[in-house]
Swiss-Prot record:
Snake venom phospholipase A2 (PLA2) that lacks enzymatic activity. Is myotoxic, induces edema, and causes systemic effects (renal changes that lead to proteinuria) on mice. A model of myotoxic mechanism has been proposed: an apo Lys49-PLA2 is activated by the entrance of a hydrophobic molecule (e.g. fatty acid) at the hydrophobic channel of the protein leading to a reorientation of a monomer. InterPro entries: PLipase_A2, PLipase_A2_dom, PLipase_A2_dom_sf, PLipase_A2_His_AS. Belongs to the phospholipase A2 family. Group II subfamily. K49 sub-subfamily. The lineage of its organism: Eukaryota, Metazoa, Chordata, Craniata, Vertebrata. It comes from Bothrops diporus. This is Basic phospholipase A2 homolog BdipTx-I.
Length: 68
C-alpha cells in the first residue's frame, strides 16, 4: 500500500514522504505524469508502471510485509 511505501521512504531517507515526494517533479504523487527528468522521478515512474501491471489486487490500498 502507499502506507508501506511511505514507511520505506521514511526509513531509508528520513524524509516525510508526503511532504518530500507527494508533488515532486513530473512523476511523483497522485497526478504525476510525463518523462522522468532525474533519478528520483525515474523511481516514481517505475513504481507507477509496476502498479499498473498488477492484477487481482489494489497495490495502493492492500497492506503487505517487508524487510531489508
Amino acid at each position: 500500500s502507499l502506507f508501506e511505501l511511505g514507511k520505506m521512504i521514511l526509513q531509508e531517507t528520513g524524509k516525510n514522504p508526503a511532504k518530500s515526494y507527494g508533488a515532486y517533479g513530473c512523476n511523483c504523487g497522485v497526478l504525476g505524469r510525463g518523462k522522468p527528468k532525474e533519478a528520483t522521478q525515474r523511481c516514481c515512474y517505475v513504481h507507477k508502471c509496476c502498479y499498473k501491471k498488477l492484477t487481482g489486487c489494489d497495490p495502493k490500498k492492500d497492506r503487505y510485509s517487508y524487510s531489508w
